[in-house]
Regions:
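A detector of single, family-specific signature residues
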Residues: 1-391
Length: 391
């Protein structure tokens, strides 16, 4: 049975396909597939006429969301596919084509021929969960950034109306602080709060807001240097509405993210400090760990590795390259904070790096590298985290 290599050049409204036979390395077919149901059915009919799905290797460049529908269609039709880094295809074309030609027809043929030169690594079967979690976790990240933006805007309003308010709460707008702003808003109203107001406030803070704090806040409100202006009240109410709306959406997203990651339940969820949200980001960004040959590739993917400067008689390491997903890097580094507090092995490793003279952030980076090695080992060995086996 002959093997076939299928290169697909992805674009928004159409996909150009090239099929090459492994037997004689000749082009079997070149055609264009529209990005609709009829086009996809035409592609499937063509593929099914060639051979069994196991004998067909499909590849296309990783092109953001334009390939999503095709990927899901191929997965449901039991055809494997391999996503290719566009940089690799560009370099391959440079080495095989002398003319500076850039057409969809040439690109799809280059992808097909490139597939013949490399080890075929099809996309993992859990594509639905991987893509869904990537979409949801990145949306959550954007919403959190928006929420932070509105918190800054709320602070700007308070600088005019009640500048003593935020310092009273140690520069943090906690749930108790937000409750006060929602129910009273202005310093004038807070200055006139009574015992009934305190009872409600105490319940809202779960008995954490003392009567002494309450009286101190009333005093600050009565003697504030802020201005009492209805325009600022309107602005504050609008910002609080937007802030609360984002909080609600983030909570809904987190529930869905938790549900999806629990269905997959990767082994690294058993590591202390990696909760459902962190695990979801790691799973979404890394995908199938088996696609990585060693932990070093995972380090490079996350951008947690030093740059290397080797020229002439000089050779030294540089700063962390910070390539790849910033969200993944952030989650991995943050996951190390509880690890060095509650896990003796990671804590000892962190202390060792600090004793070597490394600063806190540099030492945390080394802990993150160790964490990545642990994640790699857990998934490749198909076991949960066991502190007794950690070295």
């Amino acid at each position: 049975m002959s093997m076939y290599f299928v290169g697909i050049d992805i674009s928004k409204y159409k996909h150009d396909c090239c099929i090459i036979s492994a037997a004689d390395q000749q082009i079997v077919s070149k055609f264009t597939v529209k990005n609709d149901k009829d086009g996809f059915e035409h592609l499937l009919t063509t593929l099914n006429s060639l051979s069994n799905p196991e004998d067909i290797k499909i590849g296309f460049e990783s092109t953001a969301h334009y390939a999503l529908n095709l990927e899901l269609f191929l997965e449901n039709a039991h055809h494997s596919f391999m996503e290719v880094n566009p940089v690799l295809i560009k370099e391959y074309k440079k080495s095989t084509i002398l003319r500076r030609t850039k057409t969809d027809s040439v690109d799809c043929e280059s992808i097909a021929r490139w597939l013949m030169t490399v080890e075929y690594k099809p996309h993992s079967k859990g594509f639905y969960h991987s893509y869904s979690l990537k979409s949801l976790t990145r949306l959550r990240d954007r919403l959190i950034r928006q929420r932070s933006f509105y918190l800054v805007k709320i602070t700007n309003v308070l600088d005019h109306t009640f500048p003593e308010f935020k310092p009273f709460f140690n520069e943090r707008l906690s749930k108790t602080a937000i409750y006060l702003l929602e129910n009273y808003g202005s310093a004038e109203k807070m200055a006139h709060m009574n015992s009934a107001s305190y009872d409600k406030l105490r319940c809202a803070s779960r008995d954490k807001f003392s009567i002494q704090q309450f009286l101190r806040l009333k005093e600050l409100a009565a003697n504030t240097v802020g201005v009492n202006n209805s325009i600022f009240d309107i602005e504050l109410n609008s910002l609080l509405t937007l802030y609360n709306s984002l909080c609600k959406e983030i909570k809904t997203l987190e529930a869905e993210i938790t549900k999806l990651i629990e269905e997959v339940h990767p082994h690294y969820m058993s590591i202390p400090g990696i909760g459902p949200i962190s695990a979801a980001v790691i799973y979404a960004e890394y995908g199938d760990i088996s696609n990585f040959s060693n932990p070093g590739q995972m380090l490079a993917f996350a951008g947690i590795e030093p740059g290397i400067n080797d020229s002439g008689t000089e050779s030294h390491g540089g700063r962390m390259v910070k390539h790849g997903s910033s969200q993944l890097r952030y989650v991995l580094l943050n996951a190390c904070l509880p690890l060095i507090r509650f896990d003796i092995t990671f804590a000892t490793y962190y202390a060792k790096k600090r004793a070597e003279g490394k600063k806190h952030r540099v030492a945390i980076t080394h802990v993150a590298k160790k964490l990545i090695r642990v994640i790699y080992a857990l998934e490749r060995q198909d076991v949960d985290f066991n502190v007794q086996k950690l070295r």
